[in-house]
Amino acid sequence: MPKTFHRTDRVSAQLRRELGTLVHNAVREHGLPSVSVSDVEITRDMAHAKVFVTALMPERSAEAVAGLKELGYRLRMDLARAMKLRHVPELHFHYDDSVDRGEHIDNILRDLPDTLAAEKRREGDDE
């Protein structure tokens, strides 16, 4: 029976767990805006990893990502100590706006009944 998970999937899950802890500590130590690691995508050759983070305050997301990029080398060294990998991937931090987009869609759907009711009233007034 073939494996259902590739090594890159397992490594990216482990990176997500370890980086979650390291980023949490970095936020406290360096006064960065509060962020959490939402996903890690690793390249097939495991040389690069895209680290997606979400911020509690989306308006400060750029500041948080910039701070994490500055700390990238240190975080990579901490990962090397925590994980048993021959080569720790280079970290590339990105803001994950999927939560913001989901919230926007939720607001649209929540306002939809009011919009439809207003449209029906306008159609009734036109007749």
UniProtKB/Swiss-Prot annotation:
Entry keyword set: Cytoplasm, Ribosome biogenesis
Location of this chain's protein in the cell: Cytoplasm
Cited InterPro entries: KH_dom-like_a/b, RbfA, RbfA_dom_sf, Ribosome-bd_factorA_CS
One GO CC annotation: cytosol
Biological-process GO terms, alphabetical: maturation of SSU-rRNA
Presence of keyword tRNA-binding: no
PROSITE patterns in UniProt: RBFA
Mitochondrion keyword on record: no
Chief localization: cytoplasm
GO molecular function: ribosomal small subunit binding
Subunit structure: Monomer. Binds 30S ribosomal subunits, but not 50S ribosomal subunits or 70S ribosomes.
HAMAP family: RbfA (MF_00003)
Family recorded in the similarity comment: Belongs to the RbfA family.
PANTHER family noted in UniProt: RIBOSOME-BINDING FACTOR A, CHLOROPLASTIC-RELATED
NCBIfam families per the UniProt record, alphabetical: rbfA
Protein role: One of several proteins that assist in the late maturation steps of the functional core of the 30S ribosomal subunit. Associates with free 30S ribosomal subunits (but not with 30S subunits that are part of 70S ribosomes or polysomes). Required for efficient processing of 16S rRNA. May interact with the 5'-terminal helix region of 16S rRNA.
Annotated protein name in UniProt: Ribosome-binding factor A
Organism per entry: Stenotrophomonas maltophilia (strain R551-3)
